[in-house]
Amino acid sequence: CSPNSMGIHNLEKNIRISPFVFPSDLITGGIAMIIQSGSVLGALTNNDRRLRYNFFVSSGSENVTNASDYLLWALKQPSTSVVGMFLESVRDPVLFIEGLKLAKEKDIPIVILKVGRTEASSKLALSHTGALVGDFEVFKAVIEKYNAHLVYSIDEMAASLQVFSHYQTIERKGIASIHDSGGERELIVDIADDLSVPFARLSKETREKLTNVLEPTMDTNNPLDAWGSGHDADKLFKNAFLHLLSDKNVSL
C-alpha cells in the first residue's frame, strides 16, 4: 500500500500481506472495509466477531492506490454486502463519486466515518498522512446525494456495518415497537421523529386483539407500552408482539 499502512487482507482468498498480526479466527463474510488509520482497523478487527469481512485494507498514505480505488474494487466483488470507510481525506474525488454512484446502482450500503471535520483535526490529518482534508459540509452534501451513510464514532460504525451486513429490503410502511415503560415509549417516538421513521397505524383488528391480551387500563397505541402490573409478563409480551407482527401495516 504505502507508509502508515497496516496491510491488505483478502479473507476469501486467504491472502494477508501485513507486518502486523491480525486475529486468526476472523470469519469470512460480506463486509469490505477501507481504513485510512491502522489503529482503527485493528480496533474493529480485534473486537466484535459478529463483524465478518471479505476484505479489509489499511490504505495509509496512499502514494499509489487510494481509498477510491479500493472502493471500486470492493463494489465489484460478488460477496460484498456493505462497505465501511474510515476517511481522513478523499484524494481522488472523481473516482470516489464514481464509487458512490456504483454503490447506489447496486444497492450496496456504504458506511463512512469522516474525520478532519474541524480545523484542528484537519491539521492533524495533514501531519499524519499528508492528507488535505477539504470542506466537510461539501463532503456531507455529496454523501447525502448518493445515499451513503455518515457515522460519527467507531462504535456507530461497527453497529452500522453489522446491521447492513444482514441487510434486507423492507416495505415502506411503518414500524411497531413494544415496551415495558412509558418513558421508553416516549423516547423512541422522539428518536423516530428525528430520523423521519414513521410508526404504523394499527388496524382495528390488531387493536381488538391487543385489548384482549393487555390489562384493562392499558391503551393499544403504537408504540405499545404493554407492562401494566407486570403480571405474567412473558406471556403477555409474546402475544402482543405476535399481534403487532401480523398487522398488515407493520413492516418492521
Indicate where each model-derived feature is located.
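Catalytic-core regions of core metabolic enzymes
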Residues: 1-252
